[in-house]
Amino acid sequence: MSAKCIMVQGTSSSAGKSVMVAALCRIFSRRGYRVAPFKSQNMSLNSFTTAENREIAVAQVLQAEAAGIEPSHHMNPVLLKPKEDFTSQVIVHGRPAGNMNFQDYQTEFRDTALEAIRESLEYLKSRYELIVIEGAGSPAEINMRDRDLANMEIAHLADADVILVADIDRGGVFASIAGTLMLLDERDRSRIKGVVINKFRGNIDILMPGIERIEEITGVPVLGVLPYDEGLKLPEEDSASLSQRKYRGRGDIRVGVMRLPRISNFTDIDPLEYEEDVAVRLIETGDSLDDLDAIIIPGTRNTISDLIHLEENGFADEIRDLSREIPVFGICGGFQMLGKRILDDARQESSEGSVDGLGLLDCETHFTGEGKIISQSQGRVLGNGIFSGMRGETVEGYELHEGTTVLGDVKPLLRVDRGFGNTRSGGFDGAVDGNVAGTYFHGIFHNFRFRRYFTNLLRERKGIEPLEYLDDNFSASRRFSIDRLAEIVEENMDLSIIEEILEG
């Protein structure tokens, strides 16, 4: 039997669509239904590698976790990863399909993307009872309606009723609801069966006159008002959210994360914020590095451009100097920057051909145009450099990188048991020399024992008692947040529209 579908759209970006889908997946999974999330087309720099070695957005990974199932590339058949010059890398069914600008994508590739979307939707519908679909941005972008691949076009394709989520925290919620509905044509508007007001703070009685009036004006019921809950700790999808999290956590241990202009997979740093005495600070142009206990250089969608940014802003020399005193850790593109040289023979990232790296690790990275490495990975810590006390410890992560790295007179960080690491033939990953280390493994700090060892090293250097390897606050908080999110929605939203769909 083919699954029933419900779709969550928003009056704007960041209205709360992703978390609403996660909540509905959790709620109906707990009620015994086989539920799967779906987002036809996502634009995000935070991605993940599935067990199929396919790349999808992290939002769909969270939603799959909420549904109690393994993530699949069919849950996000088209992923757009912004690059330079208004182009994006287009990922279809978890594999790169090329770099395209908006015009080329719409005129030459749209039909291919739509076919992939249709195929994945049918795949999920044949295997589950309920598909919870997430839209993108707003359905009322009337200049884009005929090119839509994420909102009403998908609602019609899936024959899905739509719940519209509106963010009251940013102001103008009733205008955004009325404006969205007014701008939709009758065929699209008829799909919307209810509105949810999200991120409300205060006494709901004050809101009731507005709710009654907006229902009169639009003829669409308000299904619920969801309170703002600052206690929820869930991964962010957009880099725009970084501006709201310059400082995270409180404590004596200060970890600086370089806010690269083209930062990607910044969820790599999330687990550090759950170490009880660690303060994570995003380092932007003009900030000082003087009071830090460690520096992390994260992933980037353009290693060479962001390396040049560090040089031009004086950060490169500061990092070189501080590496004598404190740990410097690079992930993916950040690891590539730590080496002596980056050779871009294929001119993938720059017309420069090659540039000098930070010179903190004796290695070179080569971009040869051979294609992207996408893999779930596992390795064992070799116990070199600052990780001498972790020898033999198993870590897991995932790889999403172009370029391979050749080591000189420097020790690798990991022996690779599954995946690729520094080269396409596997063997070893990363490098470590004294205080400096790097890896291609995204998610390495999601490994509790690795993270606790790293932060304990920082504690000991400051004369602070190290913490025991007991409770993984990050994993526990994530599970709690998903459950709490589901409870908030269940307590504050009329779910009868979905119940009727399932019973019909």
From Swiss-Prot:
Gene Ontology molecular functions: ABC-type vitamin B12 transporter activity; catalytic activity
GO annotation, biological process: cobalamin biosynthetic process
Active site (catalytic residues): 332, 442
The entry's keywords: Cobalamin biosynthesis, Glutamine amidotransferase
PROSITE patterns per record: GATASE_COBBQ (PS51274)
Domain GATase cobBQ-type: 252-450
Pathway in which the depicted protein is active: Cofactor biosynthesis; adenosylcobalamin biosynthesis
Entry similarity comment: Belongs to the CobB/CobQ family. CobQ subfamily.
Protein purpose: Catalyzes amidations at positions B, D, E, and G on adenosylcobyrinic A,C-diamide. NH(2) groups are provided by glutamine, and one molecule of ATP is hydrogenolyzed for each amidation.
Designated name of the protein: Probable cobyric acid synthase
Name of the coding gene: cobQ
